[in-house]
């Protein structure tokens, strides 16, 4: 199953769960409002002697507070759904390196990172699995592409393995600059966009 299909399935599952949670929240909202109305009527009867105007004001205040509470519960339910969808996407992110197209994506991440750092002598840090996936000949070919883009002689060397789900971390040889193109970092950099798209899709 491709990444897009996986994401679509996750969002569809999350939407079904969203409908369930929102239905429960709506039912809770109705109960809160009904109880508030009953309480308001009761309180109204008790203070009628103080004047109808004061009674109506008290009733309105109680109902208003109940509506705010119900709205809060709905917002909490939506946030729970969004977090659930994000967590599922994170789980699928860990599985991305198992996809056949992953090597090409990894090569592009290395290339983009090297170009962003301006070429030169760079250290490519990968996890243990990807250290085997990216051989020296792949890095040699990338050196030429980076040189063409940056107009600077480029040398790419693999550094010590790093604990990431996938992707790469590129560092200058002097250690002064680095670019984190790990899958986790890319996900976090795009988290606001991801949240917005999930919200649009579900609600």
Swiss-Prot record:
Paired cysteines (S-S)? none
- What does the record note on temperature and activity? Optimum temperature is 80 degrees Celsius.
Which Gene Ontology molecular-function terms are recorded? ATP binding; proton-transporting ATP synthase activity, rotational mechanism; proton-transporting ATPase activity, rotational mechanism
* Record InterPro entries: ATP_synth_B-like_membr_sf, ATPase_E_C, ATPase_V1_Esu
The record describes the dependence of activity on pH as:
Optimum pH is 6.0 for ATP hydrolysis.
GO biological process assignments: proton motive force-driven plasma membrane ATP synthesis
A GO CC term attached to the entry: plasma membrane
Q: Which stretches are annotated as coiled coil? A: none
Q: Pfam families recorded for this chain?
A: vATP-synt_E
Q: How does it assemble?
A: Might form a homodimer. Interacts with subunit H via residues 41-60. The A-type ATPase is composed of subunits A(3), B(3), C, D, E(1 or 2), F, H(2), I and K(x).
Please provide the record's free-text comment about the domains of this protein: Purified ATP synthase is 25.9 nm long. The hydrophilic A1 domain is 9.4 X 11.5 nm, the central stalk is 8.0 X 3.9 nm and the membrane-bound A0 domain is 6.4 X 10.6 nm; the domains are connected by two stalks. ATP is synthesized or hydrolyzed by the A1 domain while ion translocation occurs via the A0 domain.
Q: Quote the protein name from its UniProt record.
A: A-type ATP synthase subunit E
The species this protein was found in: Methanocaldococcus jannaschii (strain ATCC 43067 / DSM 2661 / JAL-1 / JCM 10045 / NBRC 100440) (Methanococcus jannaschii)
